[in-house]
């Protein structure tokens, strides 16, 4: 099946799929679950300038979102879990069996494997007796080689057991993680479920289909949307997508002016047809997270939205065009600006920068919409006031 869309229709489809235009598709606690289930996962990043990435993803599209809602779903209700997918991520706990192969790989490979293996039973015994523990509770201060830099043996062992699925995160205090035995928090039926994938290739295709649905549209090529999908570097993505298309799990989308076709999940065809029938959606204004699912694929962003975005957090200050933690601003069906909000002292959300895109005029309607979005973000961050730097006027 092939659908022919204009670029405007492609934008409309993506934005409605993500709940960023029209009446809210995702509301409250259930809305968080619904969006994460639709997306497969949302990416986690611990940096918190004005909310962590996962929180920013949700605040832009879930009506009534609060940070405690997400914490409760993760650490109280256990309907969501934080684990690897597209890097560190949050995904529905019911998907646990589908990651069996990833957990098994962490049992086969890993840095400082001998030291970690020797310490594992001691760590498990400590947690079994004392309950949720962090790396500082274990007294294993020997430094070992680890993924980002040398670290304490306690941290390396806890993280390995977590990667293997023997531990889960019980809760966090800031960036400090407390781990507990998985069997205390996840249903036995999930922990004991067999791997639903018949083989590695079936597993790869499951992940590829999931990532296509997460963004909404993808071409049969490598992109950051497929990070951490096994065999992405060996042409596996294209092969998987063509097989999924042949099986009717993907549909082809030809966008006006773009030679290479895109693909969408077959589950989303009703929305494509709604857009083709002429549906129009009420415009909204939203600040988009730097690792938001919608913008995982920068080529898609350029082709469909005519917008180029670089997260400048790792760019030296002297070389930045914008700011340390700058968020794209979506207004209606266009990315119209970039904004740098920072949660400061005294319950104030400070707007350190606002840069309108070329050709965008600072109309009263636009600037009022940006200000309302800033106030919503301030509220989510527990800030009572929004302040603009002198050079930033709204």
Annotate the PLM regions.
Residues 1-286, 292-293, 300, 307-311, ...:
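Long, low-complexity intrinsically disordered regions
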């Amino acid at each position: 099946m092939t659908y022919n869309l204009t670029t405007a229709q492609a934008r409309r489809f993506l934005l409605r799929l993500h709940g960023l235009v029209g009446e809210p598709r995702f509301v409250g606690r259930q809305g968080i679950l619904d969006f994460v289930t639709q997306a497969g996962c949302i990416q986690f990043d611990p940096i918190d300038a004005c909310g962590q990435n996962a929180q920013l993803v949700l605040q832009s599209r879930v009506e009534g979102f609060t940070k405690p809602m997400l914490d409760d779903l993760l650490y109280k209700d256990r309907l969501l879990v934080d684990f690897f997918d597209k890097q560190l991520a949050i995904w529905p706990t019911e998907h646990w069996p589908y990651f069996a192969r990833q957990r098994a790989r962490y049992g086969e490979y890993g840095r400082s494997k001998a030291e970690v293996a020797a310490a594992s039973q001691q760590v498990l015994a400590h947690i079994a007796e004392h309950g949720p523990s962090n790396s500082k509770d274990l007294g294993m201060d020997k430094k070992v080689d680890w993924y980002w830099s040398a670290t304490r043996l306690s941290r390396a062992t806890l993280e390995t057991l977590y990667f293997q699925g023997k531990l889960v995160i019980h809760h966090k205090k800031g960036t400090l993680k407390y781990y507990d035995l998985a069997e205390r928090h996840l249903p036995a039926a999930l922990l004991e479920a067999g791997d639903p994938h018949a083989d590695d290739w079936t597993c790869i295709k499951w992940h590829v289909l999931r990532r296509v649905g997460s963004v909404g549209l993808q071409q049969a090529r490598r992109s950051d949307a497929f990070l951490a999908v096994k065999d992405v570097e060996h042409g596996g993505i294209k092969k998987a997508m063509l097989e999924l298309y042949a099986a009717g799990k993907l549909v082809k989308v030809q966008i006006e002016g773009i030679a290479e076709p895109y693909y969408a999940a077959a589950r989303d065809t009703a929305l494509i047809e709604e857009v083709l029938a002429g549906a129009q959606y009420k415009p909204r204004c939203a600040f988009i997270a730097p690792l938001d699912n919608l913008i995982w694929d920068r080529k898609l962003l350029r082709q469909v939205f005519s917008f180029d975005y670089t997260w400048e957090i790792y760019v030296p200050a002297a070389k930045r065009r914008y700011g340390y933690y700058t968020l794209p601003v979506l207004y209606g069906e266009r990315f119209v600006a970039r904004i740098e909000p920072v949660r400061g002292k005294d319950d104030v959300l400070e707007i350190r920068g606002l840069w309108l895109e070329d050709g965008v005029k600072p109309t009263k309607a636009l600037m009022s919409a940006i200000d309302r979005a800033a106030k919503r973000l301030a509220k989510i961050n527990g800030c009572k006031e929004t302040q603009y730097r002198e050079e930033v006027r709204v």
